[in-house]
Regions:
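Charged, gly/pro-rich active-site loop segments
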Residues: 2-15, 89-156
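Short beta-strand segments
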Residues: 30-65, 71-73, 79-83, 91-93
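Short, basic/aromatic recognition patches
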Residues: 13-32
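Hydrophobic alpha-helical segments typical of transmembrane helices
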Residues: 19-22, 69, 107
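Short, solvent-exposed cationic patches
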Residues: 13, 66-77, 118-121
């Protein structure tokens, strides 16, 4: 982080619940995110995806099995996501897990509530993933100094 952009760390005393609420509000308002995955050759690839978010900060997205991100995720589950753009943004690192069984039904229902037009892709074999958060950073560059804080999540 650039200390000059951040100024004094006034968010050091902000409790975790307040930080999470600010982050959650931004994610809730967003429909699109940039998802970055790693290829089997250890190069990065990024794609725009529609996202939903659960109370526990797990992100939900869908893809088709013939897309590069799907193949990448079968090989390496580590991902990063950028949500929101200027002036406020969330950087999110986590682990992507393909959904199945009862969990798939629950997450798919929630995602289709936010994106009803995505139902048409069911017949094409749409796949759903959840991303379990490890680390999240919030940045708002419209504030002076910039508002920047991080939240870490327990690794399960």
């Amino acid at each position: 982080m650039r200390k000059s952009a951040m100024g004094p760390n006034r968010y050091k005393c902000m409790d975790s619940d307040t930080k999470k609420k600010i982050i959650r509000d931004l994610i809730d308002q967003s429909t699109l995110a940039v998802l970055s995955t790693v290829t089997p050759q250890n190069t990065s690839e990024s794609a725009v995806v529609e996202i939903s978010v659960r109370e526990n900060f797990e992100l939900i997205f869908d893809t088709l099995p013939n897309f590069r991100k799907y193949r990448n995720l079968k090989n390496n589950h580590d991902v990063s996501v950028v949500i929101g753009f200027e002036p406020a943004t969330v950087q999110y690192e986590g682990v992507a897990v393909e959904l199945n069984g009862e969990e798939l039904k629950e997450y798919r229902r929630m995602h289709f509530q936010k994106f009803p037009e995505a139902v048409k892709f069911k017949k094409l074999g749409i796949r759903f993933f959840k991303i379990i958060p490890k680390w999240v950073r919030y940045t708002d560059v419209s504030r002076q100094p910039w508002e920047v804080f991080e939240v870490e999540f327990p690794v399960v």
